[in-house]
Design a protein with these regions (language model features):
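Short hydrophobic alpha-helices and adjacent helix-cap/hinge residues
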Residues: 1-324
Length: 324
C-alpha cells in the first residue's frame, strides 16, 4: 500500500467515530409557548408538556420549551416576533390574544391553538375541517354566551339586568355579542353593554355604575375576559353583582358559575393530536380544528345566598359540582 492510500485510509477511519457520534445525537425540537396575561399560568400548559413526555419527548434531551408570558397585545406581538426569529419549530398559543399575535408574527411557521374562540369569525382558519393555513388546534363553543345566559336564567329566575363588558377591537367580539343578544332576547334579560379595552376602562364602568343598575356581570369578548376576569370579578363582588366566570377556580372564590371544559385534558390531548404530529411533518392545514364539546357546570350556591337568592333544586342536580 503506497503512502497516499495509507493516509486516506487513516483519515477515513478517524472520521468514523465522528460520524457515529453525529448520528447518535437526537434532534432537539423547539416549542415556543405564547400566553397573554401575567395573572396566571394557562391551565393547559403543564398538562401539554406532560403529554409530550408520555410520547417520548424529554426536555433537555430531544425537546426544548420556551414559555413567554405577555403583558398585553403589544407585548404579545413583540414576543411572537422573537419566537419566530429564534426559529422554534412550532408555536403553541393560548387564547385569542396570543393566537392573533402569533398569526401576525408568521404565516408559515406552524401554530397550535389552545382555547380559540370563534376561529373562523376571527380569521384564524377557513373552516374547522380544513383550516387551510398554518394554524390548527382546539376551539371552544361558538355559542357560549347564549348558553351562559340560559344557565343564568335557570339558576336565578328573577334576575334581569346584566352588565356586559366587551372590547370592540377583538375580531371574535362581534360574534360573541350577537350570541349574547340572542340569548338575552330568548331568556328575557336586559343587557347593559359597555365597550372597554383595559383595566382602567373596566374600573370606570364600575365607578359610574349606580346601585341596583345591574345584577350580574358577563364578558362578551374572549380576550377581554381572559385578561381581566379577575378584576371584573373583584369589582363585581364589591358591587354585589353575581359573576359568570370562565374558570372553576373563580367559582371556588365566589363567582356564581362557570360553564367550561377541562383545560388540563385539552392540553394533554393537544400534545398527541397536534404538537407531535406537526413535529413529525404534518402541516396544520391537514389537521382539522377540534371543537371541544365536553363542558362542565360548576356552581357556587353561596354566591346566590349572599344576594338573597336560593339555588333551584332542578339546577343543583344537573350541575357537575356545587360549592356551598
Amino acid at each position: 500500500m503506497n503512502r497516499r492510500r495509507k493516509i486516506l485510509l487513516a483519515l477515513a477511519t478517524s472520521l468514523i467515530p465522528l460520524a457515529l457520534t453525529a448520528h447518535a445525537q437526537p434532534k432537539i425540537w423547539r416549542v415556543g409557548f405564547l400566553h397573554v396575561g401575567n395573572h396566571h399560568e394557562p391551565p393547559s400548559y403543564r398538562p401539554l408538556m406532560a403529554g409530550m413526555r408520555e410520547l417520548g419527548y424529554e426536555e433537555g434531551r430531544n425537546i426544548q420549551y420556551d414559555f413567554r408570558n405577555a403583558v398585553d397585545d403589544a407585548d404579545a406581538l413583540e414576543i411572537a416576533r422573537i419566537l419566530v426569529q429564534s426559529r422554534v419549530d412550532v408555536i403553541v398559543a393560548f387564547d385569542n390574544e396570543a393566537i392573533a399575535a402569533a398569526q401576525k408574527g408568521t404565516r408559515t411557521l406552524p401554530i397550535v391553538m389552545i382555547n380559540a374562540s370563534n376561529p373562523i369569525a376571527a380569521g384564524y382558519a377557513q373552516s374547522l375541517a380544513r383550516p387551510g393555513g398554518n394554524m390548527t388546534g382546539f376551539a371552544g363553543r361558538a355559542e357560549l354566551p347564549a348558553k351562559e345566559l340560559e344557565f343564568l336564567r335557570e339558576i336565578a329566575p328573577k334576575l334581569n339586568r346584566i352588565l356586559l363588558l366587551f372590547d370592540a377591537r377583538e375580531p371574535a367580539s362581534t360574534a360573541w355579542r350577537a350570541e349574547a343578544r340572542i340569548g338575552a332576547k330568548k331568556f328575557k334579560f336586559t343587557l347593559i353593554e359597555r365597550d372597554v379595552t383595559n383595566a382602567d376602562g373596566i374600573t370606570r364602568v364600575f365607578d359610574n355604575l349606580k346601585p341596583g343598575a345591574a345584577e350580574a356581570l358577563m364578558f362578551a369578548s374572549p380576550g377581554l375576559r381572559h385578561r381581566h376576569m379577575e378584576l371584573g370579578f373583584t369589582l363585581a363582588l364589591a358591587h354585589r353583582l353575581l359573576v359568570v366566570a370562565n374558570r372553576k377556580d373563580l367559582v371556588e372564590q365566589g363567582a356564581l358559575f362557570a360553564y367550561s371544559y377541562d383545560f388540563a385534558k385539552v392540553g394533554r390531548l393537544a400534545a398527541s393530536r397536534y404538537v407531535d404530529r406537526v413535529l413529525k411533518g404534518r402541516p396544520p392545514r391537514e389537521l382539522p380544528i377540534e371543537e371541544v364539546t365536553e363542558y362542565e357546570l360548576t356552581l357556587n350556591a353561596g354566591a346566590l345566598k349572599r344576594v338573597g337568592l336560593t339555588l333551584p333544586q332542578a339546577v343543583r342536580v344537573r350541575a357537575d359540582k356545587v360549592i356551598e
